[in-house]
Every structure is written in structure tokens, then in C-alpha cells.
Amino acid sequence: HVFEFKPNDLTVNAAWSFLSQRLIYLNGKKICILGAGNIGSKLALKLVESGAEVCIYRRNINRGNIVVNGLNLIKPERTITKIQLYSDAIQASSMADVLIGASSGSPIIDANIVKNLRKECLIVDLGKNNLTGNAIKIATEYSMNIYRTDVTPAMESFVYELLKTQDILKRSCGKKDLGFCNIVSGGYF
């Protein structure tokens, strides 16, 4: 079988799972995402829905405003916190518990940003090469933790979900009349 999937969504799910396990509680954590494209914006929404204080930096501030306004409009009404947009990456990340680089292939976390982070801040690279060499060197000198999320667990759960759905559609679809009510299984109506 060939299964259709969206790699960016697996990356978002892997990052969210990693953060929820590593931090234990996301509620109240200040998480800064540098890069608000497909991955960064989807992750921001999941994190704010979990109670995190999310701030975003995007190089193109006009697009950043559109993204943040859209995310704040579609998040659940009862979600108290709002996603904040910053025009300066250092200002956005200076008090973060977690700094996430979600840029597509170009370094967005440099030495100046790392120097201004809290020493306990976790640094997460969601793409490839989101940190400059000097940023890695300084973070290492400061004994800061740098992580790159692994999509393996997200891929495994995704494949399991697909196979389970396939099984439901093959064997469980249907309707049964019990006389006093109808029972409809998952699948077709």
C-alpha cells in the first residue's frame, strides 16, 4: 500500500510530543518560535492550546502579523493566552523557557540570540541548520541543551493510525438494528 502523509505535520507532532514529555507541563511555559511558516505556525497553535505562552518571530513582519492574527482567531475561545508577534528575535527569545528554530534551511538562531537566552533555556532545531556554528559553540560553552526532534515516534503512530483506520473501514463498517435502536459503527453512514 501507498499511504499519503504530510511530513510537516509529523514534525509538528514530534516536536509537541517531545516538549510535552521533556517539560512535563506546557501550561505557563514561555516558548519562542523563530520562523512562523507551515511548521512554526502549526506548532504555535498546538502549544498555545496547551496553555503555553507562545511568541513568534518572523523575518517578514507583515506576514507574521497575518499568521499570528489568524492563529489567534482560530484557537479555541477558552484558550486564555494569545500568540504574540515580535519584530526582534532577541527580544522575543530573551525570557524563553524553550527556543525553537523553525526556519526552512537557513540559520535563524545566531550567537547574539544564544548570548541573550536564559541559561536554562532549551534550544530545539526543527529544521536543518537553524543554528549557526557560533550559536552552537556558545550554547555548548554555556552548557545549554540543544535538541533536534526525531519524527520516528510520530511516524510510527501515524502508520498505526492508518492501519487501524484501514481495518475499521474493511471490517467494521455497517449498521445493526437492535429493534429499539440502530447502532452505527465507525466508517460510512
Region locations from a protein language model:
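Glycine/serine-rich phosphate-binding loop and adjoining beta1-alpha1 elements at the start
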Residues: 1-27, 160-163
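Structural motif
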Residues: 5-6, 34, 57, 126
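Short glycine/serine/threonine-rich phosphate/pyrophosphate-binding segments
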Residues: 12, 39-43, 64, 106-110, ...
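Glycine-rich phosphate/diphosphate-binding loop of Rossmann-like nucleotide-binding domains
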Residues: 20-101
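Short, solvent-exposed amphipathic alpha-helical segments in soluble enzyme
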Residues: 48-49, 72, 115-118, 139-141, ...
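Rossmann-like adenosine-cofactor binding region
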Residues: 81-154
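Adenosine-phosphate binding glycine-rich loop
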Residues: 128-130, 134-189
